[in-house]
Amino acid sequence: MKYAFFLGCIMPHRYPGVEKATKIVMEELGVELEYMPGASCCPAPGVFGSFDQKTWLTLAARNLCIAEEMGLDIVTVCNGCYGSLFEAAHILHENKEALDFVNEKLDKIGKQYKGTIKVRHFAELIYKDIGVDKIKEKVVKPLDVLNVAIHYGCHFLKPSDVKHLDSPERPKLLEEIVAATGAKPVMYRDYLMCCGAGGGVRARFLPTALDMTKEKIRNMLEAGADCTVNVCPFCHLQFDRGQVEIKEKFGEEYKLPVLHLSQLLGLAFGMKPEDLAVSVHAIPVDPVLKKLGIE
């Protein structure tokens, strides 16, 4: 399997370790990821789409065109990028007026969107195409001592009427992937609540965003979580860097380790922590490594 790898903004600039972890984990699972030359911001659906939908749609379509030129479907590890590109492709498929408008703009840079590719989230790809049985086969370091609080995020499952990935209210997809590593997914209060960062809230109303993050982290800890696992670098940033900001603004310290799903899988596959770049997180992951007996 080969896919066009859409990086987005947060991962390469703030968490390049997630990028590396994704590359080597997917390689282990038989998936080749090829970088997309000239790709831009997705762009962020909650920001661009709110102010100017036509501009958002045109920029997203340009990224889709790059993958079409490569002859590859897109895979991304970011919920926001997935939401933006998937929903743009859906609109362009369903709305000829929007397609004509976008292609008129794209024609000026020598591109045309044809609608020949699909947009995939890497967790969806793992679950639907690779399968949890393959994950189990690849596990060399069972994570059976680890209690994991899963964070789905907002754009992964919704809008559910067009994505059809899983139940938007009682999902199980990530639980099954995490459980395949031997780790125990733990249920906690407000399980599907936003991390607090999305929709421009972090950028404009940081205290409000941190209040939401703080509530989620408290709930995770009360449920006995050793760490939280996400499938979105922006959510990852909010939980990881957000804990530092919570201490600075509210004087409250939590220290809940934060892992992207690719990093959790990498640990289960026996990959070295330094290859997964977990040491560069704002909140130390050492308690997780110590519990797993990893030096």
Curated annotation (Swiss-Prot):
Pathway: Cofactor metabolism; coenzyme M-coenzyme B heterodisulfide reduction; coenzyme B and coenzyme M from coenzyme M-coenzyme B heterodisulfide: step 1/1. Its EC number is 1.8.98.-. GO terms for biological process: methanogenesis. Pfam families: CCG. Disulfide bonds: none annotated. Keywords: Methanogenesis, Oxidoreductase. GO terms for molecular function: CoB--CoM heterodisulfide reductase activity. The keyword Transcription regulation does not apply. InterPro entries: CoB/CoM_hetero-S_Rdtase_bsu (IPR017678), Cys_rich_dom (IPR004017), HdrB/HdrD_reductase (IPR051278). Part of a complex that catalyzes the reversible reduction of CoM-S-S-CoB to the thiol-coenzymes H-S-CoM (coenzyme M) and H-S-CoB (coenzyme B). Belongs to the HdrB family. NCBIfam families: CoB_CoM_SS_B. The heterodisulfide reductase is composed of three subunits; HdrA, HdrB and HdrC. This is CoB--CoM heterodisulfide reductase subunit B 2. It comes from Methanocaldococcus jannaschii (strain ATCC 43067 / DSM 2661 / JAL-1 / JCM 10045 / NBRC 100440).
